[in-house]
């Protein structure tokens, strides 16, 4: 009798909040993964040299925003897919994703605020179902501005431990010339891409197109814009996770971005790396090209 009650009401039981139905096992997984995410951040706080909570409330606020970000990503996925498994999956991945957890708990990175704003914008668009060129440009331009805002390398280096293309040549040589030229190059290419999109007579704006655009600009700017810091991959990690949830064949995008981001964290804190850093720069460029092709395909639909 008790076994049957537990099976029917807990293991196989379902609950409803409004239109959202979820199973007891979904709730159990969400609670457990949230607890694991908290413990991950607590462990990162204990790393030698990390001020953790002693550094003030700023780092704690960023860690709380990690969970807000994960919830917003789950809301966006629910509003665009209504797939319960994908909702639980994206939340679970986001709260324990190493690049996201490390950005806040290890680096105290302000970038999570940018990510929260962009995903909140996606949620508003998804809830109101206003997929049009105005909302597309709004998201794309904000993503571009937020990604550029992450550049804070010292004036004598073209990158702050982030594998952009300048690691292929010289991080310190001709930094004044490359600095100006790199900025003009990025702005010029972005304007050409935007001009091409604006001239298309018919563009079907979809959630997939919005995510593809956000991923492309975040990857492109982080790869070619000078003075990027070692935390510059957060937005690409977030958009990469959303793209993977939308298209399982893109599983390699968030995985590769997570590796690149964590290598950058390690390079910054250790001052050395076991593999040539320029190899990760090539990987970043390949991911950017792949994202560009995917964006082009979405524009043709």
Locate each region found by the language model.
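Transmembrane helical bundles and short interhelical boundary loops of multi-pass, membrane-embedded
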Residues: 1-22, 29-46, 109, 142-166, ...
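Short hydrophobic alpha-helices at membrane interfaces in multi-pass membrane enzymes
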Residues: 115, 125-141, 213-215
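Membrane-water interface signatures at transmembrane helix termini and the short loops
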Residues: 20, 107-111, 191-247
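Loop-to-helix entry region of an early transmembrane alpha helix in multi-pass inner-membrane enzymes
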Residues: 18, 25-29, 52-71, 87-91, ...
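Aromatic- and kink-enriched transmembrane "portal" helix at the membrane-lumen/periplasm boundary
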Residues: 55-59, 92-112, 219-226
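Transmembrane-helix signature of polytopic, membrane-embedded enzymes
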Residues: 68-99, 129-137, 203-209
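Aromatic/glycine/proline-enriched transmembrane-helix motif characteristic
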Residues: 37-38, 144-223, 298-299
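Specific aromatic-rich, kink-prone transmembrane helix
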Residues: 75, 98-101, 113-129, 239-240
């Amino acid at each position: 009798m008790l076994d049957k009650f537990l099976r029917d009401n807990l293991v196989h039981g379902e609950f409803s909040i409004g239109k959202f139905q979820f199973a007891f096992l979904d709730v159990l997984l969400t609670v457990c993964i949230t607890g694991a995410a908290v413990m991950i951040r607590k462990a990162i706080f204990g790393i030698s040299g990390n001020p953790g909570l002693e550094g003030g409330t700023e780092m704690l606020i960023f860690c709380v925003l990690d969970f807000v970000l994960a919830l917003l990503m789950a809301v966006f996925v629910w509003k665009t897919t209504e797939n319960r498994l994908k909702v639980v999956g994206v939340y679970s991945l986001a709260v324990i994703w190493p690049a996201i957890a490390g950005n806040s708990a290890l680096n105290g990175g302000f970038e999570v605020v940018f990510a929260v704003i962009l995903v909140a914008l996606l949620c508003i668009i998804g809830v109101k179902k206003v997929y049009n060129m105005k909302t597309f440009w709004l998201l794309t331009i904000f993503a571009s501005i937020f990604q550029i805002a992450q550049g804070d390398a010292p004036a004598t280096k073209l990158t702050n431990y982030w594998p952009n293309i300048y690691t292929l040549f010289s991080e310190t040589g001709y930094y004044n010339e490359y600095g100006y030229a790199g900025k003009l190059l990025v702005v010029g290419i972005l304007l050409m891409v935007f001009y091409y999109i604006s001239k298309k007579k018919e563009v079907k704006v979809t959630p997939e197109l919005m995510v593809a655009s956000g991923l492309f600009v975040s990857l492109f700017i982080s790869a070619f814009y000078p003075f990027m810091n070692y935390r510059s991959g957060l937005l690409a990690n977030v958009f990469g996770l959303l793209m993977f949830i939308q298209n399982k064949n893109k599983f390699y995008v968030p995985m590769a971005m997570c590796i690149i981001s964590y290598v950058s964290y390690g390079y910054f804190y250790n001052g050395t790396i076991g593999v040539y850093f320029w190899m990760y720069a090539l990987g970043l460029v390949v991911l950017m090209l792949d994202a560009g092709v995917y964006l082009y395909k979405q524009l043709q639909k």
